[in-house]
């Protein structure tokens, strides 16, 4: 079977009067490669699904989902990897005749953070609530339908939160407030984030404040990033967003020298990936010109530097204490997961 965004091949056989077995694999443009296995009763089979990389933006990988028919519906077990570390989940899909279908999440564990709750599918949409706790994170995610629209509201707070991703992530304090409103096939987003003391591996950011307002994928986002305590780094930026393009302008200071984008940085959707046309970043008397492409398939980054002060690296890695300046080029390509080629001059 083939379609513009889906290819699938499989085979199966009937194993009894009302039982069968089926195996197949394919690729979907958004969710990547997948394997599917069905076996058991024709009307209530066991289902096993493996997704290689269903949501790259969240770092989801090797996602396994298994459904088993039980009294009252299906039990489910899921697991995989993510940017925040490994996750696992189990619960029930309740299909009681005469009642709304419901997903009961008994356990959704990401690193040490747990979410539990029940979400029902009503005539108007999804209704329910997931309660989040543990690992330094507390709050909830609310699902509320009505008047032809679906609201998803997240209120989450973090204090000394840690996630076992690769590399590990830690957050001293953070508050996320987000409303996602789905209306007639379009999505509206109003989100605010305030965070301090964020680290990912050796990268450290002192403070982040951001706000985004999008209507059906278009709108604006503003954010401010500052260095750790004692740092003089601060950068303010604004992004004009459409579904196929992000246009970012911004400027700031570090150690008394101006840091700015000479022209807006653009991210453009092209096919199944994104491109960054040549953009120049000026810092003090130096500059760096970069262009890139990333997404499925081949990815690349081209960077050319002229008299760029090395102290700029101290923004994210404050203990390095580098001095001097750098001239040269860096070309990085990635043609397959886990393989990279780097050229320097």
Predicted regions and their residues:
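Interface amphipathic segments
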Residues: 1-345
């Amino acid at each position: 079977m083939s379609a513009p965004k889906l290819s699938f091949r499989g085979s199966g056989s009937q194993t009894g009067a009302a039982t069968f077995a089926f195996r197949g694999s394919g690729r979907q443009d958004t969710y990547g490669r997948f394997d599917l296995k069905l076996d058991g009763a024709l009307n209530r089979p066991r289902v096993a699904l493996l997704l290689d990389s269903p949501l790259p933006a969240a770092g989801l990988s090797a996602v396994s989902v298994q459904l088993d028919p039980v009294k009252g519906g299906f039990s489910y077990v899921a697991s995989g990897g993510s940017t925040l570390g490994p996750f696992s989940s189990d619960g029930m899909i309740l299909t009681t005749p005469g009642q709304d279908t419901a997903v009961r999440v008994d356990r959704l564990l990401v690193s040490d953070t747990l979410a539990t709750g029940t979400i029902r599918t009503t005539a108007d949409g999804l209704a329910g609530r997931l309660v989040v706790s543990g690992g330094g994170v507390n709050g909830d995610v609310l699902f509320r339908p009505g008047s032809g629209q679906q609201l998803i509201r997240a209120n989450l707070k973090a204090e000394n939160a840690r996630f076992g991703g690769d590399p590990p992530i830690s957050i001293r304090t953070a508050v996320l407030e987000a409303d996602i409103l789905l209306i007639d096939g379009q999505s509206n987003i109003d989100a605010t984030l305030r965070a301090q003391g964020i680290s990912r591996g050796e990268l450290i950011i002192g403070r982040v404040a951001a706000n985004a307002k999008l209507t059906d994928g278009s709108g604006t986002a503003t954010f401010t990033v500052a260095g750790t305590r004692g740092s003089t780094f601060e950068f303010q930026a604004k992004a004009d967003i459409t579904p196929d393009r992000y246009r970012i302008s911004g400027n700031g200071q570090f150690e008394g020298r101006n840091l700015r984008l000479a022209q807006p940085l653009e991210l453009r959707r092209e096919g199944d990936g994104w491109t960054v046309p040549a953009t120049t970043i000026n810092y003090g008397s130096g500059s760096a010109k970069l262009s890139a492409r990333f997404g499925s398939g081949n990815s690349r980054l081209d960077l050319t530097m002229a008299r760029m002060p090395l102290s700029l690296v101290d923004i994210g890695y404050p203990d390095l204490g580098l001095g001097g300046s750098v001239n040269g080029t860096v070309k990085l390509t990635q043609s397959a997961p886990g393989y990279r080629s780097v050229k320097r001059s």
